[in-house]
């Protein structure tokens, strides 16, 4: 049976494990209508447009 030759230190284990749980950055695009930041392929919550089409009215 395979056995490790030396014990892996706690810092090496945590360093390796940290890459699994690394948070990734969320991609952000700009709304072509109002210029506000929004998630890609989603309706802009600031103005209610998806691309050039008005999807819903925004109550202000």
Curated annotation (Swiss-Prot):
Source species taxonomy: Bacteria, Thermotogati, Thermotogota, Thermotogae, Thermotogales
A Gene Ontology molecular function term of the record: structural constituent of ribosome
Domain of life: Bacteria
Disulphide linkage map: none
Keywords assigned: Ribonucleoprotein, Ribosomal protein
Any one annotated GO CC term: large ribosomal subunit
UniProt protein name: Large ribosomal subunit protein bL32
Record family assignment: Belongs to the bacterial ribosomal protein bL32 family.
GO biological process: translation
Keyword Flavoprotein: no
């Amino acid at each position: 049976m395979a056995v490790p030759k030396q014990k892996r230190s706690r810092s090496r284990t945590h360093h390796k494990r940290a890459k699994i749980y690394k948070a990734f950055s969320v991609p952000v695009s700009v709304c072509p209508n109002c210029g506000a930041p929004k998630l890609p392929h989603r309706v802009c919550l600031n103005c209610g447009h998806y691309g050039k089409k008005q999807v819903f009215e925004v109550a202000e």
